[in-house]
Amino acid sequence: MATVNVFVAHAKDDNDDFIEQAVVKFKLRFSKNQYVFVLGKFDHTQNMKRLGNWDAWEKNVVYGTRYGTTERKYGIIFCINRVVGKATANIVQHALTAGTKVVLLDDGVFSVVKAVQKLETDDWKRGWMLQA
């Protein structure tokens, strides 16, 4: 059974129970592999200072490699909100460009994200919508 690292993209203000419930649903739905889930807030805490800016961190989520290998550190980007902020929108856009699978859980339904749409707002926290 392969182990797949999954980046959990969530809003900064999502509560831990909401995030955990989404991870449990993912595990139940996609049980053929072993998964290691890394919350966005943990990756951000571990890497942002070293990388120096948001753009570098967003790219590192998608293009960064596992230590000592050429394998990307995340095989799946898992989004738990359809409406997202700028950082998640950028991560998803990089992932789509790189061919990394992006999975969305929205109202209990899983789908594969195909695009990111900018909404008619200047809200950096909720100004983009994921399209399946």
Task: Report the location of each language-model feature.
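Conserved catalytic or regulatory cores that recognize and/or transform ribose-phosphate-containing ligands
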Residues: 1-132
